[in-house]
Protein backbone atom coordinates (compact mmCIF):
# COMPACT_ATOMS: atom_id res chain seq x y z
CA UNK A 1 0.00 0.00 0.00
CA UNK A 2 1.28 3.48 -0.89
CA UNK A 3 1.07 5.66 2.21
CA UNK A 4 0.90 9.45 2.14
CA UNK A 5 -0.09 11.93 4.86
CA UNK A 6 -3.89 11.83 5.13
CA UNK A 7 -4.25 15.59 5.68
CA UNK A 8 -2.45 16.41 2.40
CA UNK A 9 -4.06 16.33 -1.04
CA UNK A 10 -2.46 14.18 -3.73
CA UNK A 11 -0.97 17.30 -5.34
CA UNK A 12 0.43 18.51 -2.01
CA UNK A 13 1.97 15.09 -1.39
CA UNK A 14 3.67 15.17 -4.81
CA UNK A 15 4.90 18.75 -4.45
CA UNK A 16 6.20 18.14 -0.92
CA UNK A 17 7.54 14.70 -1.81
CA UNK A 18 5.63 13.44 1.22
CA UNK A 19 5.46 9.65 1.26
CA UNK A 20 5.81 7.59 4.41
CA UNK A 21 8.54 4.96 4.66
CA UNK A 22 7.50 1.32 5.14
CA UNK A 23 8.91 -0.15 8.37
CA UNK A 24 10.86 -2.87 6.53
CA UNK A 25 12.86 -0.18 4.67
CA UNK A 26 13.52 1.63 7.96
CA UNK A 27 14.81 -1.68 9.33
CA UNK A 28 17.07 -2.08 6.27
CA UNK A 29 18.47 1.41 6.82
CA UNK A 30 19.29 0.79 10.48
CA UNK A 31 20.79 -2.60 9.69
CA UNK A 32 23.09 -0.91 7.17
CA UNK A 33 23.98 1.82 9.66
CA UNK A 34 24.63 -0.51 12.59
CA UNK A 35 26.93 -2.65 10.46
CA UNK A 36 29.40 0.24 10.54
CA UNK A 37 28.51 2.43 13.54
CA UNK A 38 27.70 1.98 17.22
CA UNK A 39 24.79 4.42 17.16
CA UNK A 40 24.17 4.54 20.94
CA UNK A 41 26.65 7.38 21.40
CA UNK A 42 25.12 9.57 18.69
CA UNK A 43 22.13 11.87 18.51
CA UNK A 44 19.74 10.81 15.73
CA UNK A 45 18.15 13.58 13.67
CA UNK A 46 15.47 13.35 10.98
CA UNK A 47 14.83 16.81 9.49
CA UNK A 48 11.82 15.68 7.43
CA UNK A 49 10.40 13.10 9.79
CA UNK A 50 6.75 12.84 8.65
CA UNK A 51 5.18 10.26 10.93
CA UNK A 52 8.58 9.57 12.56
CA UNK A 53 9.11 6.05 11.20
CA UNK A 54 12.89 6.53 11.61
CA UNK A 55 12.52 7.64 15.22
CA UNK A 56 10.39 4.81 16.62
CA UNK A 57 13.40 2.87 17.91
CA UNK A 58 14.52 3.08 21.55
CA UNK A 59 17.43 5.53 21.59
CA UNK A 60 18.93 7.92 24.19
CA UNK A 61 18.47 11.05 22.06
CA UNK A 62 16.45 11.35 18.88
CA UNK A 63 15.06 14.50 17.28
CA UNK A 64 12.39 14.85 14.62
CA UNK A 65 11.43 17.94 12.65
CA UNK A 66 9.24 18.66 9.64
CA UNK A 67 7.97 21.61 7.63
CA UNK A 68 4.43 20.25 8.06
CA UNK A 69 2.98 21.76 11.27
CA UNK A 70 0.53 18.86 11.57
CA UNK A 71 3.37 16.42 12.21
CA UNK A 72 4.00 15.72 15.89
CA UNK A 73 7.51 17.15 15.72
CA UNK A 74 9.49 20.40 15.69
CA UNK A 75 8.10 22.64 12.96
CA UNK A 76 11.23 23.63 11.04
CA UNK A 77 11.98 24.30 7.39
CA UNK A 78 15.17 22.28 6.99
CA UNK A 79 16.11 24.15 3.81
CA UNK A 80 16.08 27.69 5.27
CA UNK A 81 19.17 28.68 7.28
CA UNK A 82 19.97 25.13 8.45
CA UNK A 83 22.04 25.00 11.63
CA UNK A 84 22.38 22.69 14.59
CA UNK A 85 21.01 25.16 17.11
CA UNK A 86 17.63 25.09 15.32
CA UNK A 87 17.29 21.52 16.60
CA UNK A 88 18.87 22.04 20.03
CA UNK A 89 22.04 20.22 19.01
CA UNK A 90 25.44 21.52 20.15
CA UNK A 91 28.32 21.96 17.71
CA UNK A 92 30.42 19.17 19.26
CA UNK A 93 27.54 16.70 19.69
CA UNK A 94 28.09 13.40 17.80
CA UNK A 95 25.33 13.38 15.19
CA UNK A 96 23.80 10.97 12.68
CA UNK A 97 21.17 12.17 10.21
CA UNK A 98 18.61 9.53 9.22
CA UNK A 99 15.42 9.47 7.21
CA UNK A 100 13.74 9.53 3.84
CA UNK A 101 13.91 13.18 2.74
CA UNK A 102 11.39 14.41 0.16
CA UNK A 103 12.29 14.13 -3.50
CA UNK A 104 10.42 15.73 -6.36
CA UNK A 105 12.23 16.49 -9.63
CA UNK A 106 10.32 19.43 -11.10
CA UNK A 107 11.79 18.71 -14.56
CA UNK A 108 10.76 15.05 -14.64
CA UNK A 109 7.81 14.02 -16.78
CA UNK A 110 6.49 11.79 -13.99
CA UNK A 111 3.22 13.14 -12.51
CA UNK A 112 3.77 16.33 -14.50
CA UNK A 113 0.00 16.84 -14.67
CA UNK A 114 -0.24 17.52 -10.94
CA UNK A 115 3.17 19.04 -10.23
CA UNK A 116 3.07 22.75 -9.54
CA UNK A 117 6.28 24.46 -10.53
CA UNK A 118 5.08 27.58 -8.68
CA UNK A 119 4.76 25.59 -5.44
CA UNK A 120 7.14 27.60 -3.25
CA UNK A 121 8.57 27.47 0.23
CA UNK A 122 11.76 29.15 1.34
CA UNK A 123 15.00 27.49 0.26
CA UNK A 124 18.44 29.05 0.75
CA UNK A 125 20.11 29.98 -2.54
CA UNK A 126 23.07 27.66 -2.03
CA UNK A 127 20.68 24.74 -1.42
CA UNK A 128 18.38 25.29 -4.39
CA UNK A 129 18.10 22.49 -6.92
CA UNK A 130 15.53 21.21 -9.38
CA UNK A 131 14.97 18.32 -6.96
CA UNK A 132 14.05 18.71 -3.29
CA UNK A 133 16.05 15.63 -2.35
CA UNK A 134 19.30 17.13 -3.62
CA UNK A 135 18.54 20.28 -1.61
CA UNK A 136 18.11 18.14 1.51
CA UNK A 137 21.41 16.33 0.99
CA UNK A 138 23.19 19.67 0.70
CA UNK A 139 21.48 20.89 3.87
CA UNK A 140 22.77 17.83 5.73
CA UNK A 141 26.36 18.76 4.87
CA UNK A 142 25.91 22.14 6.58
CA UNK A 143 24.92 20.39 9.84
CA UNK A 144 28.19 18.36 9.72
CA UNK A 145 26.98 15.00 11.04
CA UNK A 146 29.46 12.16 11.41
CA UNK A 147 27.22 9.89 9.32
CA UNK A 148 24.18 10.23 7.08
CA UNK A 149 21.90 7.24 6.44
CA UNK A 150 18.99 8.13 4.17
CA UNK A 151 16.88 6.93 1.27
CA UNK A 152 17.03 8.83 -2.02
CA UNK A 153 16.75 8.11 -5.76
CA UNK A 154 19.79 6.26 -7.06
CA UNK A 155 19.80 8.72 -9.96
CA UNK A 156 21.31 11.40 -7.69
CA UNK A 157 24.54 9.41 -7.76
CA UNK A 158 24.62 7.48 -11.02
CA UNK A 159 23.52 10.30 -13.36
CA UNK A 160 26.56 12.52 -13.75
CA UNK A 161 24.52 15.72 -14.23
CA UNK A 162 22.72 15.06 -10.93
CA UNK A 163 25.95 14.16 -9.17
CA UNK A 164 27.48 17.50 -10.18
CA UNK A 165 24.55 19.27 -8.47
CA UNK A 166 25.62 17.63 -5.20
CA UNK A 167 28.86 19.65 -4.97
CA UNK A 168 28.26 20.99 -1.46
CA UNK A 169 27.48 17.43 -0.35
CA UNK A 170 29.98 15.35 -2.34
CA UNK A 171 32.89 17.60 -1.32
CA UNK A 172 32.32 16.69 2.34
CA UNK A 173 30.85 13.17 2.31
CA UNK A 174 31.63 9.85 0.68
CA UNK A 175 29.47 6.78 0.07
CA UNK A 176 30.40 4.08 2.58
CA UNK A 177 27.71 1.44 2.00
CA UNK A 178 24.40 1.09 0.19
CA UNK A 179 21.43 -1.08 -0.72
CA UNK A 180 19.37 -0.50 -3.87
CA UNK A 181 15.62 -1.09 -3.46
CA UNK A 182 12.56 -0.57 -5.64
CA UNK A 183 10.34 2.51 -5.57
CA UNK A 184 7.24 0.29 -5.71
CA UNK A 185 6.71 0.90 -1.98
CA UNK A 186 6.11 4.56 -2.81
CA UNK A 187 4.58 4.62 -6.28
CA UNK A 188 2.22 2.31 -8.15
CA UNK A 189 3.85 2.82 -11.55
CA UNK A 190 7.07 4.03 -13.14
CA UNK A 191 9.24 1.84 -10.93
CA UNK A 192 12.74 3.21 -10.42
CA UNK A 193 15.72 2.47 -8.16
CA UNK A 194 16.04 4.02 -4.72
CA UNK A 195 19.21 3.68 -2.68
CA UNK A 196 19.48 3.31 1.07
CA UNK A 197 22.79 5.14 1.31
CA UNK A 198 25.24 5.43 4.20
CA UNK A 199 27.67 8.34 3.97
CA UNK A 200 30.63 9.24 6.16
CA UNK A 201 32.82 12.34 6.30
CA UNK A 202 35.15 12.57 3.31
CA UNK A 203 34.74 13.42 -0.35
CA UNK A 204 33.85 11.56 -3.53
CA UNK A 205 33.94 12.09 -7.27
CA UNK A 206 31.97 10.53 -10.10
CA UNK A 207 34.71 7.99 -10.77
CA UNK A 208 34.14 6.66 -7.24
CA UNK A 209 30.45 6.17 -8.03
CA UNK A 210 31.21 4.42 -11.32
CA UNK A 211 33.45 1.97 -9.44
CA UNK A 212 31.09 1.45 -6.50
CA UNK A 213 29.44 -1.98 -6.29
CA UNK A 214 25.82 -1.43 -5.26
CA UNK A 215 24.10 -4.43 -3.63
CA UNK A 216 20.43 -4.74 -4.62
CA UNK A 217 17.35 -6.26 -3.01
CA UNK A 218 17.41 -8.88 -5.81
CA UNK A 219 20.58 -10.47 -4.34
CA UNK A 220 22.59 -9.04 -7.23
CA UNK A 221 24.99 -6.14 -7.57
CA UNK A 222 25.13 -3.16 -9.90
CA UNK A 223 28.35 -1.45 -10.96
CA UNK A 224 28.33 1.23 -13.66
CA UNK A 225 31.81 0.29 -14.84
CA UNK A 226 30.62 -3.23 -15.68
CA UNK A 227 28.81 -1.94 -18.77
CA UNK A 228 29.26 0.11 -21.93
CA UNK A 229 26.60 2.61 -22.97
CA UNK A 230 25.00 3.73 -26.23
CA UNK A 231 25.81 7.37 -25.44
CA UNK A 232 29.43 6.54 -26.28
CA UNK A 233 28.40 5.95 -29.90
CA UNK A 234 25.40 8.17 -30.75
CA UNK A 235 23.80 11.50 -29.94
CA UNK A 236 20.99 11.35 -27.39
CA UNK A 237 19.76 14.90 -27.81
CA UNK A 238 18.87 17.22 -30.74
CA UNK A 239 21.91 17.51 -33.00
CA UNK A 240 20.93 19.43 -36.14
CA UNK A 241 24.26 21.25 -36.29
CA UNK A 242 26.26 18.02 -36.15
CA UNK A 243 24.51 15.95 -38.84
CA UNK A 244 24.61 16.88 -42.52
CA UNK A 245 23.12 14.06 -44.60
CA UNK A 246 20.18 12.83 -42.52
CA UNK A 247 18.51 9.43 -43.09
CA UNK A 248 15.99 9.51 -40.26
CA UNK A 249 14.76 11.05 -37.03
CA UNK A 250 14.69 9.76 -33.47
CA UNK A 251 13.06 10.78 -30.23
CA UNK A 252 15.53 12.36 -27.74
CA UNK A 253 16.77 9.94 -25.09
CA UNK A 254 17.27 10.19 -21.34
CA UNK A 255 17.54 6.80 -19.62
CA UNK A 256 16.09 3.29 -19.91
CA UNK A 257 12.92 4.21 -18.02
CA UNK A 258 12.33 7.14 -20.38
CA UNK A 259 12.85 4.82 -23.35
CA UNK A 260 10.02 2.62 -22.06
CA UNK A 261 7.64 5.59 -22.19
CA UNK A 262 8.81 7.34 -25.34
CA UNK A 263 8.79 6.74 -29.07
CA UNK A 264 11.88 5.73 -31.03
CA UNK A 265 11.89 6.53 -34.78
CA UNK A 266 9.91 9.58 -35.92
CA UNK A 267 8.42 10.31 -39.33
CA UNK A 268 9.04 14.04 -39.54
CA UNK A 269 11.75 16.51 -38.49
CA UNK A 270 11.35 19.14 -35.80
CA UNK A 271 13.62 21.26 -33.64
CA UNK A 272 13.43 18.63 -30.91
CA UNK A 273 14.58 15.48 -32.70
CA UNK A 274 17.82 13.56 -33.01
CA UNK A 275 18.94 13.47 -36.64
CA UNK A 276 20.40 10.16 -37.80
CA UNK A 277 23.37 9.84 -40.14
CA UNK A 278 23.79 6.67 -42.21
CA UNK A 279 26.81 5.44 -40.24
CA UNK A 280 24.86 5.68 -36.95
CA UNK A 281 21.62 4.12 -38.18
CA UNK A 282 22.42 0.63 -36.84
CA UNK A 283 22.80 2.02 -33.32
CA UNK A 284 19.38 3.65 -33.41
CA UNK A 285 17.96 0.36 -34.69
CA UNK A 286 19.66 -1.26 -31.69
CA UNK A 287 17.91 1.22 -29.37
CA UNK A 288 14.57 0.48 -31.04
CA UNK A 289 14.95 -3.23 -30.23
CA UNK A 290 16.32 -2.49 -26.76
CA UNK A 291 13.00 -0.78 -26.03
CA UNK A 292 11.23 -4.11 -26.61
CA UNK A 293 13.20 -5.86 -23.87
CA UNK A 294 13.49 -2.90 -21.47
CA UNK A 295 10.39 -3.91 -19.41
CA UNK A 296 11.91 -7.37 -18.92
CA UNK A 297 15.14 -6.31 -17.21
CA UNK A 298 15.41 -5.51 -13.47
CA UNK A 299 14.13 -2.15 -12.24
CA UNK A 300 17.58 -1.12 -10.99
CA UNK A 301 18.78 -0.54 -14.57
CA UNK A 302 16.01 2.04 -15.10
CA UNK A 303 18.07 5.20 -14.59
CA UNK A 304 21.07 4.03 -16.61
CA UNK A 305 21.79 4.91 -20.20
CA UNK A 306 20.94 2.22 -22.74
CA UNK A 307 23.46 -0.59 -22.33
CA UNK A 308 25.40 -2.18 -25.18
CA UNK A 309 28.18 -4.72 -25.62
CA UNK A 310 29.68 -2.89 -28.57
CA UNK A 311 32.04 -5.59 -29.81
CA UNK A 312 29.44 -8.38 -29.46
CA UNK A 313 26.82 -6.25 -31.24
CA UNK A 314 29.07 -5.44 -34.20
CA UNK A 315 29.95 -9.12 -34.58
CA UNK A 316 26.28 -10.10 -35.06
CA UNK A 317 24.75 -6.83 -36.27
CA UNK A 318 23.22 -8.28 -39.45
CA UNK A 319 21.64 -11.23 -37.62
CA UNK A 320 20.62 -8.92 -34.77
CA UNK A 321 18.57 -6.73 -37.10
CA UNK A 322 16.92 -9.63 -38.93
CA UNK A 323 16.46 -12.41 -36.38
CA UNK A 324 14.51 -12.12 -33.12
CA UNK A 325 16.24 -15.22 -31.75
CA UNK A 326 19.67 -13.68 -32.32
CA UNK A 327 18.58 -10.55 -30.48
CA UNK A 328 17.23 -12.57 -27.59
CA UNK A 329 20.47 -14.52 -27.19
CA UNK A 330 22.47 -11.30 -27.31
CA UNK A 331 20.35 -9.67 -24.59
CA UNK A 332 20.46 -12.80 -22.42
CA UNK A 333 24.25 -12.64 -22.47
CA UNK A 334 24.27 -8.87 -21.93
CA UNK A 335 22.22 -9.20 -18.74
CA UNK A 336 23.61 -12.55 -17.60
CA UNK A 337 23.49 -12.86 -13.82
CA UNK A 338 20.53 -10.50 -13.46
CA UNK A 339 16.90 -11.66 -12.95
CA UNK A 340 15.33 -10.91 -16.34
CA UNK A 341 11.96 -12.04 -17.71
CA UNK A 342 13.02 -13.04 -21.20
CA UNK A 343 10.89 -15.65 -22.98
Question: What is the predicted function of each stretch?
Answer:
Residues 126-183, 197-198:
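Conserved Class I SAM-dependent methyltransferase catalytic core
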Residues 107-129:
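Mobile active-site "lid"/loop adjacent to the S-adenosyl-L-methionine
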Residues 77, 97-104:
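Amphipathic alpha-helical repeat scaffolds
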Residues 75-95:
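Short amphipathic alpha-helix with an adjacent loop that forms part of the alpha/beta core around
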Residues 54-55, 105-108, 156-160, 206-207:
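Short catalytic/ligand-binding loop motif for oxyanion handling, primarily in non-cytosolic enzymes
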Residues 190-246:
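Flexible, glycine-/basic-rich loop-and-beta segments that form/coincide
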Residues 245-343:
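C-terminal target-recognition/interaction regions appended to catalytic cores
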Residues 1-80, 317, 324-343:
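Class I S-adenosyl-L-methionine
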Amino acid sequence: MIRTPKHLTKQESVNLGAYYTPPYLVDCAYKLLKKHVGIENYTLLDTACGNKEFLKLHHPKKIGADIDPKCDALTINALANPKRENYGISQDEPLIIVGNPPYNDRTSFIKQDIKNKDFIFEIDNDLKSRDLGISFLKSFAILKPAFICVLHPLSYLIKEANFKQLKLFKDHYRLLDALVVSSKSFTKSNEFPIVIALYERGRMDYADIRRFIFPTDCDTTLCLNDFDYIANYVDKYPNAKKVGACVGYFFPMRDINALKRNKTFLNAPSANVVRISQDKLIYYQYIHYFKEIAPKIPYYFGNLDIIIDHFAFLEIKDAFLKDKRARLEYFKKLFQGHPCEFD
